[in-house]
């Protein structure tokens, strides 16, 4: 089923994007705190 493959890869892609967004938020917050401390 090409459908199933598409849906699976798409959901995996969505998960990756969510993880990247989360990491960007965490790293951004940490970076801002470090800058404020200097």
Swiss-Prot record:
Biological process (GO), any one: neuropeptide signaling pathway
Subcellular location, principal: secreted
Pfam families recorded: Hormone_2 (PF00123)
Keyword Cytoplasm attributed: no
Residues recorded as bearing Lysine amide in the entry: 38
Keywords recorded for this protein, A-Z: Amidation, Hormone, Secreted
UniProt lineage: Eukaryota, Metazoa, Chordata, Craniata, Vertebrata
Sequence intervals crossing the membrane: none
One GO CC term, this protein: perikaryon
Described function: PACAP plays pivotal roles as a neurotransmitter and/or a neuromodulator.
Listed InterPro entries: Glucagon_GIP_secretin_VIP (IPR000532), VIP/GHRH-like (IPR046963)
Protein family membership: Belongs to the glucagon family.
Organism: Uranoscopus japonicus
Record-given protein name: Pituitary adenylate cyclase-activating polypeptide
Subcellular compartments: Secreted
Top-level taxon: Eukaryota
GO molecular function terms attached to this record: neuropeptide hormone activity; peptide hormone receptor binding; pituitary adenylate cyclase activating polypeptide activity
């Amino acid at each position: 089923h090409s459908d199933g493959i598409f849906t699976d890869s798409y959901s995996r892609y969505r998960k990756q994007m969510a993880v990247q967004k989360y990491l960007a938020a965490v790293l951004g917050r940490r970076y801002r705190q470090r800058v404020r401390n200097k």
